[in-house]
From Swiss-Prot:
Ranges in a coiled coil: 1-29
Key words of the record: Coiled coil
Protein's UniProt name: Uncharacterized protein ORF161b
Keyword match Coiled coil: yes
Natural source organism: Acidianus two-tailed virus
């Protein structure tokens, strides 16, 4: 079973209610840990992009799961808490593998193009959250995640929840 199949299966089980979000994240952690030990037939920048695309897909699925749990207050609180956990989890994973990412990219002369995978994921999360909350971005830049969290809290407070 490929990495893609593993993640797809986990996403499907989450959507069908066969597993809880905590189990999803735990199994996901094990999947991410195994990425570098797998004998993937991809190297360098291609491997980096495969992993990045997989992580973005995971973040999107996780966000959509939580939006299905709204509108009660506890669900909104848990979104904020969960975003922080996801961000910490992914940041830690990227930090531990940063040397490997950089080695892969430097081999392709792409050192100056290295971006934080965690930040890319937060952009994806923010895009999904903004859309779900009815916001649309008018500019091509994204608001800082801290500002977004404050905005999310304000929405929660003004809805009388």
């Amino acid at each position: 079973m490929t990495l893609y199949d593993t993640v797809k299966e986990l996403q499907e089980k989450l959507r069908n209610g066969e597993i809880e979000i905590n189990t999803f994240l735990e199994r996901l952690g094990l999947t991410l840990d195994s990425i570098w030990s797998q004998k993937l037939r991809v190297t360098g920048l291609f491997k980096y992009n495969v992993i990045k695309a997989t992580l973005l897909s995971i973040a999107k699925t996780t966000c959509m799961y939580y939006f299905n749990k709204i509108p009660d207050v506890e669900a909104e609180d848990s979104i904020i808490t969960t975003l922080t956990k996801i961000y910490s989890f992914i940041s830690q994973n990227v930090k531990e593998n940063r040397d490997k990412f950089e080695t892969e990219l430097v081999a392709f002369g792409k050192q100056n193009e290295i971006k934080s995978v965690a930040d890319s994921i937060m952009i994806m999360i923010v895009e999904n959250l903004m859309a779900s909350l009815g916001y649309t971005e008018t500019e091509k830049k994204y608001i800082p995640i801290s500002d977004f969290m404050i905005r999310l809290q304000n929405i929660q407070n003004t809805t009388g929840s």
